Amino acid sequence: MHIHKLKAKIKKKHQEKYLTKKKIQKKLFLNESEFRRLCIFKGIYPKDYKDIPLKFRNKFYKNKVYYTRNDYKKLSNEKIIQDFRKIKTSLKRYKKYKITLEDNERCKNIIKNFPKYKLDHIIKERFPILVYAVEQLNDALTAIIAYSFLPSNENIGIKNNLINQSIILRNHVKGYYLQAEILQKKITWLIPHIFTPYFDKSIDFKIITNFIEYYVTLLRFILYKLYRLDGMSYPPKEYKDLKNEKLNHLSFDKNYITKELSNELETKESTEDNIIEENEKKTKNGKTENCEKNDQENEKKTKNDKTKNCEKNDQKNDQKNDQKNDQKNDQKNEMKQIEHDIIXNDNTKSVKNLFKNHIFYIHSNMPFDVLSIIILSCGGTICWNSLYSPYKYDDKSITHEILEVSEENKNTQDSNKINNINEYTYKRSFIQPQYIFDCLNSNMILSCEDYNINKTLPVHLSPFIDDDNYKDLVKKDEYTINKMLSEDPQYNKSIQKNKTNSENKXNNYNDNENDMSEDEYNNAIRQKLRNDALNNQMEAENENNYNPQNDLKQENDLLNVQKINNQENIKRNKLALSKKKRKLYNKIEQAENRQKLTIEKFIKKSKNKKKQK
């Protein structure tokens, strides 16, 4: 074969590797929405124009969307395409019988037998091992939790069924940990605050629903596997009484239900069992009376046969009652393991027993869901304002109370309770919600003095920093920033004014206690202590650890910080410019860099000539 013919064949092969979106849709007989949904489920994404080799880019257009031939093969062999076609035909039939023929009975039959598709086989293909599926939980959990807060609006594309499913899965996940370790892999996700949703027309919510439809099946698959590893059944049973309560996740877990609440639920179940047993006894007595009458009338042979049948029925009923009693005893033994321990152990530092023997009362204005799950997962107990709470507000066994006092809370229902704080000052400690998060991050119980009501809270540090090198860098940056601020004359003038004001306030505090608040006094003292600490640190470095190299390092650090700040400001200003002005600015920068390079070369040549002489 001639060389030119070989080259022509090679070009055709490269051209056939990439197919446009419209060609694939025509071959598969799919709409854009169906094709998009199928690509999301299969994890297939289009190719960039830059990925195509340079030799064959001339015959491709930048604005079009291209897929590879291997992607087309994966999509063509998919079973869901047939389900999409069945859904189309069923919708056409429904419109025909509803609008033209007005036959409601057939419409009901179509709705009952409406086709559905499943994504189980796709997840097994994409994730043959459970560890690969766990790696993608970061995006799945954040999307499901955010979608559960949205209201249903099918005109935009937000379906009510998926919202309910995402809420149920959110309650199945035990412990709303922002970071969890599953199968030796760390997973992080976000729990957003309660917000009022704003529907933007630029956002296509139908695409989001397609992603969440995939994430819901993935999360169910992982939960099923994890429950089976622990020897548990999925989906777990739920208590009907706790469905409409704030703590929906308690209705799925027997281990987290407290002693008093479990007794109430057992009494309801026992009453139902007693009613069933009474009905069974009545049926027994009726059967025995009928047997005696028939025995007197019939012969001796028939008597023996009937008495045997009656005895067998009695034995079966006795066995059923024995099985029910055994199940009740097993449930009671399980609940005894969950009893509240009175003795406090200060040495327990593990996360599971961190809040052991602590009882927290949570007010209605607090972030109830997150706090409740953290406390329960760490071995604590919870109280709240409802009939199903295990402890009431007036109970003396409560150790901590979580609330935040503000001007808004004074008009709420909790105002009466907040005004009566003096009654419980010696028995319980009043805490802000940051206390629980800081205790969990440090894996130890902290003192409650810094987290009392109407006090400025300490800095909330991120718990995800594991590298010691990163911690050292943060400390250096803080020191350099404080040093830069101390060197600025404007900042020093403001500090001096604050010093004089704080000293005058400290001297005249005893005279003007009613005029000055506690927060202002504490802020003034903190500013004074901070400035004193900086001065002492600078003096100690100059006296004991004086090295000229350290001074050079500090100066270099300051220069680097200034350069970084200047670069960030330049980038921000670039974004505000138009395209033409950006191009001009880039050309100016390139010209300046060229001039600098030429000057540096000229200086080097001159230095080398002097050395040679």
From Swiss-Prot:
Annotated coiled-coil segments of the chain: 259-344, 492-601
Organism: Plasmodium yoelii yoelii
Protein name (Swiss-Prot/TrEMBL): Pescadillo homolog
Family label: Belongs to the pescadillo family.
Single GO cellular component term: nucleoplasm
PANTHER family (alphabetical): PESCADILLO - RELATED, PESCADILLO HOMOLOG
Domain of life, per lineage: Eukaryota
Key words of the record: Coiled coil, Nucleus, Ribosome biogenesis, rRNA processing
Gene3D superfamilies listed in its UniProt record: BRCT domain (3.40.50.10190)
Cellular compartments annotated: Nucleus, Nucleolus; Nucleus, Nucleoplasm
Main subcellular location of this protein, as a coarse class: nucleus
Low complexity: bias regions: 497-511
Functional description taken from the UniProt entry: Required for maturation of ribosomal RNAs and formation of the large ribosomal subunit.
The keyword Coiled coil is annotated on this UniProt entry: yes
GO biological process: maturation of 5.8S rRNA from tricistronic rRNA transcript (SSU-rRNA, 5.8S rRNA, LSU-rRNA); maturation of LSU-rRNA from tricistronic rRNA transcript (SSU-rRNA, 5.8S rRNA, LSU-rRNA)
Chain residue ranges for the region called Disordered: 268-333, 485-517
Domain BRCT: 350-453
Bias type Basic and acidic residues, positions: 278-333
Cysteines paired by S-S bonds: none
GO MF annotation terms: ribonucleoprotein complex binding; RNA binding
